[in-house]
UniProtKB/Swiss-Prot annotation:
The gene is srp54. Its main location: cytoplasm. CDD domains: SRP54_G. This is Signal recognition particle 54 kDa protein. GO terms for biological process: SRP-dependent cotranslational protein targeting to membrane. It comes from the Archaea. Belongs to the GTP-binding SRP family. SRP54 subfamily.
Amino acid sequence: MVLDNLGTSLKDALRKIANSGKIDKEVIDEVVKDIQRAMIQADVNVKLVMKLSSTIKNRALTEAPPAGMNSKEHVLRIVYTELVNIVGKATPVALQSQTIMMVGLQGSGKTTTSAKIARYFARKGLKPAVICADTYRPGAYDQLKQLCDKLGVGFYGEAGNKDAVAIVRNGLKEMAKYDVKIVDTAGRHALETDLIQEMKDIYGLTKFDHKLLVLDAAIGQQASEQARAFNDAIGITGVVITKLDGTAKGGGALSAVSDTNTSIAFIGVGETPDDMERFDPDGFISRLLGMGDLRALVERANEVLQKDDVNVEKMMQGKFTLNDMYDQLEAINKMGPLKQIMSMLPLGGLGGNITDDMYKMTQDKLKGYKVIMDSMTAAERDDPKLIGSSRIARVAHGSGKSPEEVRELLKYHKMMQKAMKGMKGGGPGGKMNMQKIMKQMGMK
């Protein structure tokens, strides 16, 4: 999950609210100090932190809870809404024909990000192409071409041409039939006059629908200075924050967005091609606090799963065979890394107890289960009760696993079957209310 340490610290602060006998000034002061400490450790700008904490404190002490909500729930909602406000609104990026200019510092991950954003549009049913305008970095052309070929998106570049403006002009003509054209400019330092002029010249070639600045989350509060310089040069319309999954200082990049009155368009949360997500403020904070992001989960499922991948209705009726579990594991593998999928679920305090080693072990276990099920007959997968000691030995031998691992799989299936039956009695989906959020977070 992005900004793991910040999320853990914020959840700890919110538990103090939920576990307090009453909400008074002393409790509010203590919680606000915890929030301040957590945000500053994540490299969020101090002025922004002070403004946030002042707003939370003022609202918590002066506002009366609305009808049907107690004081604990009300303060929790205040913290949640103010955290959403601090990250700002998302940059609207429509699923339609458009031209996008990508700018950023050297080493920000801009070239990879350009290809991943093209992949995002392809997943949505559009036809994207990336134009390579980086004529300075050795290997930029080859890297981007290989990425685009791998991801199945269009590519245009001129390996021997050093005139970036001419390349973009030609590329826009050649790729005119593509829905989305993404121009990957050379990485630069904001104070390099010649490169800034080149960027302005490219900007003057066409009406760009978006000018997206790529920021590496790890650069911390230096992001603000860079964002202002790029904004002054071409007027950026949105920010893409990369590598949020690998740094404790992502708050600096978030501060830069607020500091320049821009907004976030995409966030990079992993290394795979599908780990570039449209930014959703509510979902981002919800995931940060361990409340999950069911909207993102449903969106990811809709993108990668076929209609018949998982028979949900049959499973909810209580009939959950090994075939169903096999389909479920296949679906999980299609949707991406387990850690990322788990971050979209409302695990509350449980999520923070799962280490990276545990995720890896669990992912390996799931792969092992699939190998075991491949060694079963269709009848055995449809009715696990058929699998006695002799069949366990046969399946273990055929899969290269131990009999204990086969028994563990059968035990896991029983647990999942029981869980599916329990879900049958659950209420309709939708956003959780504050009481459910408190329970999910391990609060009283």
